[in-house]
């Protein structure tokens, strides 16, 4: 198991509180008091300690898990101004919408799967001793227009690897948003100790293959007729990059 995923809370009640927040993405103090077998008088103290130790962040009554993920970065390309930043639970609806908009083009099957998972779980970020999942988003104003997603493996022998998906909605392509998202995702993956990052796309998605190759990725393998898009069978192109 990666060192980064070994969590030490120092108290059983703190572990229960962290686990609850991590599973739900965001919660309020009232949720903890109602749903946990923890002395209500101690909850605010334990949250304060978890906040001090860098496990949780508190904004008003909202409690979220903390990732060591950096800050928002602003960019401009021509008339387009955008921000790349860590995703928050409040981005869930906009992020799912952006991923599904890209997936509807029928050329990014893995992205569609990611949208299904977070839509079902209703949780964006995961950080526990079995699973790690991070999103960064690109926003124009308050709208999510792109994302990068990094998810580690649950298997011990694959914990040096992580899957990455990245996408930008059609109207905002060509402004370097995808490149900034990819760079941010790979930086984060490297900081978490991952060594090999992989992605898979249909062979018909020439743009995605060229984009990744232009950023140092290589074709690792091809699985023939792996996807069925309508009446047509399409190969899966498996790509990776080493950090």
PLM regions and their residue ranges:
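Conserved acetyl-CoA-binding loop-helix of GNAT-fold acetyltransferases
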Residues: 166-168, 174-191, 210-214
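Conserved catalytic-core motifs of GNAT/GCN5-like acyltransferases
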Residues: 58-61, 198-200, 216-233
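Acetyl-CoA-dependent GNAT
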Residues: 113-169, 242
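Helix-loop element at the rim of GNAT/NAT acetyltransferase active sites that forms part
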Residues: 97-114
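Conserved N-terminal entry element of GNAT/NAT acetyltransferase domains
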Residues: 2-5, 51, 55-90
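A conserved beta-turn-beta hairpin within the catalytic core of GNAT-like acetyltransferases
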Residues: 24-25, 154-164, 173, 192-195
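Conserved GNAT acetyl-CoA-binding A-motif
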Residues: 30-31, 182, 189-201
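Conserved beta-strand-loop-alpha-helix junction that forms the acyl-donor binding cleft
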Residues: 39, 199-209, 226-227
């Amino acid at each position: 198991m990666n060192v980064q995923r070994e969590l030490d809370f120092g108290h059983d009640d703190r572990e229960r509180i962290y686990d609850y927040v991590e599973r739900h993405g965001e919660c309020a103090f009232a949720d903890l008091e109602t749903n946990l077998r923890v002395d209500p008088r101690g909850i605010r103290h334990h949250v304060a300690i978890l906040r001090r130790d860098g496990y949780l962040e508190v904004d008003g009554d909202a409690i979220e898990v903390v990732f060591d993920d950096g800050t928002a970065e602003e960019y401009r390309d021509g008339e387009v101004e955008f921000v790349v930043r860590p995703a928050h639970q409040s981005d869930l609806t906009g992020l799912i919408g952006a991923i599904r908009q890209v997936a509807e083009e029928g050329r990014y099957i893995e992205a569609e799967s990611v949208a299904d998972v977070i839509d079902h779980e209703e949780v964006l970020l995961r950080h526990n001793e079995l699973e790690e999942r991070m999103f960064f988003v690109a926003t124009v104003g308050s709208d999510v227009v792109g994302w990068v997603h990094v998810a580690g493996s649950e298997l011990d022998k694959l914990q040096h690897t992580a899957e990455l998906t990245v996408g930008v909605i059609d109207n905002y392509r060509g402004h370097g948003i995808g490149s900034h998202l990819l760079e941010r995702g790979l930086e984060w993956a490297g900081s978490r100790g991952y060594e090999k990052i992989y992605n898979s796309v249909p062979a018909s998605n020439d743009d995605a293959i060229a984009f990744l190759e232009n950023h140092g990725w290589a074709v690792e393998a091809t699985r023939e007729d792996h996807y069925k898009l309508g009446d047509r069978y399409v190969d899966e192109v498996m790509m990776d990059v080493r950090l």
